[in-house]
Amino acid sequence: MVKNNKISNSCRMIMSTNPNNILMRHLKNLTDDEFKCIIHRSSDFLYLSDSDYTSITKETLVSEIVEEYPDDCNKILAIIFLVLDKDIDVDIETKLKPKPAVRFAILDKMTEDIKLTDLVRHYFRYIEQDIPLGPLFKKIDSYRTRAINKYSKELGLATEYFNKYGHLMFYTLPIPYNRFFCRNSIGFLAVLSPTIGHVKAFYKFIEYVSIDDRRKFKKELMSK
């Protein structure tokens, strides 16, 4: 019985010090309108897609804040809450900063600390600047090869659109929404990266692929 109590107390301690649980305590009682304000303010700190503004959950938002700002998630949440004229005090112990994705050359070394947005941003830049790819980026580059074969006509139309308007802001990517949506979007935009520039390609990726879809793809990539 004493042993069970120790286990129970230990679990409660973990729950009370987990950054996700601490941040969630401040979000869980917000009204829908208040949460919408929080989401829009969060866009100053997080990469949100268009669909995230209507579909992101409190749990996903918290996970993204903790992942993007592991050392400052408490400060970021406090700043975000100022949009509601609320002054909150979040006491969270900091941890080591996540390792930049560019340092990882092989899939076996991938960890939870790597951000998919880092991988994609660096990958698009490498493609635009014709920088030799390491094994991890070669794995991602297979999606570009697939896109060339599968979307040759659509890629031509996207290039024509960009050459005419100088951007892809209002261009709808011809990628069907299914379990391959994230990887196909990466591949399609990677082909366009030398033409439109890696920055525009990256922001189109953020605009189109939601945080939830990015997380699902990251788990799939890490499981292989």
Curated annotation (Swiss-Prot):
Inducers of expression: Expressed in the early phase of the viral replicative cycle.
Protein name, per record: Protein OPG034
Pfam families given in the database record: Poxv_Bcl-2-like (PF06227)
Keyword Transmembrane helix: no
Keywords carried by this UniProt record: Early protein
The organism's place on the tree of life at top rank: Viruses
Keyword Hydrolase carried by entry: no
Organism encoding this protein: Vaccinia virus (strain Copenhagen)
InterPro entries associated with the record: Orthopox_C1, Poxvirus_Bcl-2-like
Family, similarity comment: Belongs to the orthopoxvirus OPG034 family.
